[in-house]
């Protein structure tokens, strides 16, 4: 197993074809690659008690959630996980929430989605390649702001 510091945590909720991102302020957190046969990860987030009801609902309903996590340094690209809440524990004025799930190959999905959209817009051949490069550069510029 490998353990990393959790720097930032966002909940991603589907909104049409995209995701809405909501930041959850961390007090502290860890992320563990279990390196098991199912490639599962455990995420532990230590949070202010104002968020406890939401995570208790997720646990009770056994809902899958999509989380975006920055690991080790805030300058790292975020990793996307499909998880379920394992447990929620009150700790004084705070609580911890334990998630278990798998990392999602988000970049591959984004590339496929962008290519599909370009083809639907009528691009093909060399024009498709050029427009794809332009949009990738544009997306990277928007994400670096």
Predicted segment positions?
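N-terminal "first-domain core" detector
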Residues: 1-43
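Charged, low-complexity, helix/coiled-coil-prone segments
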Residues: 1-8, 24-27, 54-58, 62, ...
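Short secondary-structure transition/capping segments
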Residues: 6, 10-17, 45, 112-125
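Compact, well-ordered interaction domains used in eukaryotic information-processing assemblies
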Residues: 32-83
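Intrinsically disordered, low-complexity acidic/polar segments
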Residues: 52-54, 76, 92, 106-110
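Short peripheral tails and domain-boundary helices/loops at the edges of structured domains
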Residues: 84-108
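Mixed-charge, glycine-accented linear interaction segment located at domain edges/termini
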Residues: 103-145
């Amino acid at each position: 197993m490998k353990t990393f510091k959790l720097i930032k945590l966002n909940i991603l909720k589907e909104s049409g074809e995209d995701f809405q991102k909501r930041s959850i302020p961390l007090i502290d957190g860890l992320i563990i690659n279990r390196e098991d046969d199912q490639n599962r990860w455990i995420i532990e987030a230590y949070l202010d008690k104002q968020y406890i009801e939401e995570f208790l609902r997720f646990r009770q309903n056994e809902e899958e959630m999509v989380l975006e996590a920055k690991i080790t340094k805030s300058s790292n690209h975020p990793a996307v996980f499909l998880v379920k809440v394992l447990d929620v524990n009150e700790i004084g004025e705070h609580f911890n929430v334990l998630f278990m799930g798998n990392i999602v190959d988000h970049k591959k999905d984004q590339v496929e989605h962008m290519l599909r959209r370009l083809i639907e817009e009528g691009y093909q051949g060399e024009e498709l390649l050029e427009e794809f490069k332009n949009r990738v550069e544009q997306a990277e510029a928007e994400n670096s702001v």
